[in-house]
A protein has these predicted regions:
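Acidic, glycine/polar-enriched metal-coordinating patches/loops
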Residues: 64-147
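Intrinsic low-complexity, repeat-rich intrinsically disordered segments enriched
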Residues: 1-59
Length: 147
């Protein structure tokens, strides 16, 4: 395999079937480039309390554990068409609350109350209509299906 260091590559039909990028992404010659961040990897944000600003350039899917109440700030590097999920797990105390800044749009304009149980898991499913309008749907209290 050869290494090419450049900031711009034009990929034409030239006998090259696939380009492989050092971030784990590929280009299959169909005009699409897949980078590691678009494959569905979940970026763990760790324990969170207070202001939380997510950098959407780093991934599309995120997880965090609430150790206190949070304010979900407007994300940085949001691109129209981007989408993903934010998994919110409560610590062993539970009963954490949240608020969100204006980019985050929810049905009816009112954020739902997060689950209150210790170790409860909620999911914020999001899609960026524009760089400053993020449509969200919150799924509360994720639990295994009964068998």
């Amino acid at each position: 395999m050869s290494t090419l260091n450049t900031s711009n590559i034009k990929h034409e039909t030239s006998g090259i079937n696939t380009l492989v990028f050092d971030n784990g992404g590929t280009s299959g010659g169909n005009g699409r480039v897949t980078t590691k961040g678009t494959i569905g990897e979940i970026s763990a944000l760790g324990n969170k309390t207070g202001d939380v600003t997510i950098d959407f350039r780093t991934a599309n899917n995120f997880s965090m554990t609430l150790t206190g109440n949070i304010v979900l700030k407007n994300p940085s590097n949001c691109a129209a068409g981007q989408s993903g999920v934010i998994y919110i797990t409560h610590d062993g105390t539970g009963s954490r609350t949240w608020s969100a800044e204006a980019y985050w749009e929810v049905p009816g304009g009112t954020l739902p109350t997060l689950s209150t149980g210790a170790n409860a898991v909620d999911a914020v499913i999001w899609h960026a209509r524009t760089a400053s309008k993020i449509t969200t749907q919150v799924v509360l209290d994720l639990s295994p299906s009964p068998q």
